């Protein structure tokens, strides 16, 4: 290399090799980023259907929420008439129709007890649960299974660790009958939260639990629960025809 006969030739070759190496390194880095971008985009694209299937298991979901002025769910009859008119206008048909009322609130789990106050709720803790409460009539409409529950008794299913034979909510204790599965699917687990489903004997017991939960949170702090009516169904026709029905 240091010989005068080929010093210029060899030094020029080494210089060009170093420049080429820098260029190749840049190309490798850019190629890697292209692969990462393509794979991430494809994963997101492919995962959209799976996410939608969990979050919205049926073609149409209508939710009527508690009116804060009257603290009641609006009358569902006008909404159902609008749906019927849309079916008549478009010629589409409904199937797998489900209508049910639920009370929904968040709580922090400690063993077989749920803390109804939201002071420690961060939205990221593994002990945070979304609690969905419905009555046996709504459960029968979803599953086709008729069940009879005694006062103070509830069916329970969770996608987290199973609860014991009892559950303490605020100052009240429920006797639990565990379910092996549950047809009402929520997207809470996708967001990192577990979901607990409770089936109460009747609507009055659901409303009583809601009143107790709201009274407890009013005294100790926390978020008041809402009574919602959910109407779900599948539609015949193509995606475009379903959109026209809206």
Give the ranges of each region predicted by the language model.
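Glycine- and acidic
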Residues: 26-29, 230-232
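Alpha-helical transmembrane segments
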Residues: 32-58
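Basic-flanked hydrophobic alpha-helices used for secretion and membrane insertion
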Residues: 52-246
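Short, charged low-complexity intrinsically disordered segments located at boundaries
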Residues: 21-23, 40-46, 111-119
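Feature of multi-pass inner-membrane transport and sensor proteins
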Residues: 1-28, 34, 38, 46
């Amino acid at each position: 290399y240091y010989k005068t006969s080929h010093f210029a030739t060899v030094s020029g070759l080494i210089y060009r090799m170093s420049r080429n190496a820098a260029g190749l390194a840049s190309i490798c880095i850019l190629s890697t980023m292209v692969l990462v971008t393509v794979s991430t985009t494809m994963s997101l694209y492919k995962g959209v259907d799976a996410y939608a299937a969990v979050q919205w298991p049926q073609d149409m979901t209508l939710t009527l929420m508690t009116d804060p002025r009257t603290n009641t769910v609006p009358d569902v009859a006008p909404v159902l008439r609008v749906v019927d008119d849309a079916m008549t206008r478009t010629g589409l048909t409904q199937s797998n129709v489900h209508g049910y009322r639920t009370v929904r609130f968040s709580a922090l789990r400690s063993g077989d007890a749920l803390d109804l106050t939201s002071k420690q709720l961060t939205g990221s803790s593994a002990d945070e649960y979304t609690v969905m409460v419905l009555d046996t009539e709504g459960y029968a409409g979803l599953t086709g299974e008729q069940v009879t529950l005694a006062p103070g008794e509830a069916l329970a299913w969770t996608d987290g660790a199973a609860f014991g034979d009892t559950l303490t909510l605020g100052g009240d204790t429920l006797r639990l009958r565990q379910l092996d599965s549950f047809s009402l699917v929520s997207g809470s687990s996708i967001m990192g939260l577990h979901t607990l489903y409770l089936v109460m004997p009747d609507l009055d017991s659901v409303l009583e639990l809601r009143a107790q939960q709201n009274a407890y949170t009013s005294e100790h702090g926390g978020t008041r629960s809402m009574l919602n009516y959910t109407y779900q169904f599948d539609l015949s026709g193509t995606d475009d025809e379903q959109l026209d029905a809206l």
